[in-house]
Amino acid sequence: MTDIREYLAHKPLLFDGGMGTYYKAAPGVECELANLTDPEGVKRVHAEYLAAGAQAIKTNTFGLPRMAAAQMPGWEELAEAGWKLACDAAAEKDAVVFADLGPALDTEAAPASSAYGLAAQQFAALGAKNFLFETLSSDVGVVEAVKALRVAVPDAFIMVSFAVLPDGYTREGLLFRDLLHRMEGSGVVDAVGLNCVSAPGAMKKLVQGLGETRLPLSVMPNAGYPVVTRARVLYQGKPEYFAREMGQIAAAGVRILGGCCGTTPAHIAA
């Protein structure tokens, strides 16, 4: 796949599912560190999602903006390793790789725009063309970072995805519809969407109530809602339920589909 925009004009794009909740990291250890400590394990997860039918996969770098902002030793090597592992796996299936960037803190010492910018520019230097800013509770600093990224990589495909509760608001009290309109008005974002926090049924209701949008929509819900059993966090939601709800989400016009926490290759294959 060479041109995502052209691809989306003809059919939906299927992403992978959760990385951190599927990869069995040791308690207290950041999943991203596995890029360096267990590269074969990370590549195996990528390969399983690709075998399940994913046409796009995310780098295992969700926490990179915060790591970059804190100047965590070795964050650049972690990004490079995550990028290479995903690219190696995707090359075997002609899939596309998205540089994955989770939420950044916004402080006076380290503005969110700087954190996003550092992480995104690191991937740009590695040759990344596709970027996903995900699980955001606000748009603070995002558009500024994306504008700079657009200068560095003019033909980049850039997605911004927000974590929204079933009532349509983020945990910072921002309405998704307003965030969507701001991303559409920015002129630099290629797709906007929802991921994490909510289950497929809740996201289905949200997108069905949106009406027509100017940008392609992405929806990547959790498998269900988390329950704690014997000190383990488990997500309710069988692959069959996930597939049924995602089919209805696609029927509502959503062009980019995938999964977040609790989803597995079985959910993507379904």
Label each region the model flagged:
Residues M1-A270:
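Domain-level signal for soluble alpha/beta catalytic cores
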